[in-house]
Amino acid sequence: MTDGIYLNRPQHIYELRCVGFDEHLDYVVNKYPHFSGKTFFIGGNHMDTYFKNGGSDMGKAISREREDLIYLNPDTADLKIGKVGIHMHHGGGGRSYSLSYKLQRYVETLPQDKKIDIVMQGHFHNAMYMYYMGKHCFQVGALEDETPFSRSMGFKNEKSCYWVDIEVDDKGNIYSIEPTLEVFESKKLIRRR
């Protein structure tokens, strides 16, 4: 939802559209689109910087301001919609040689006795869908433009989101899934001086 505040990268402040917890909160609350549904979300390393640097939980603050944005947890959460089990995980570390590798390895660690139908993993700023080990798996894209930092690291942001239509039987088994990737226009790199 936000890029966070990286005190260990002094140039980071010059790459932001707005600066500080309050401005970031206002930006999300005012700019995140409104639509008829709810957005369930978790945090991650970017949003965790507010907690590390000042003890503030950006996810909780966003949910207090927008009742359609439901914050579940800082890093990992399980959600049930009807009988469909959804597992969200932010992820961590660097990118791998192939787009699916980190997601595949993570899915292999999930408990097999738990009903998880859909796995959604973030962090890597790439988008992809695959069916693996009986689970519909999504590598979700980024909600931010490419930054000078990501460019210097050789990371290409895929600014996007998935819209997912599913059909389930009475037991909650998915028999049809249609993921649609919406790609957003990226803006020009920002570096303020």
Model-inferred region functions:
Residues 75-82, 130-132:
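Short acidic-hydrophobic surface loop/beta-edge motif
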Residues 1-71:
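Core catalytic region of metal-dependent phosphoesterases/phosphodiesterases
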Residues 33-38, 84, 133-134:
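Short glycine/proline-enriched coil/turn segments at helix->beta-strand junctions
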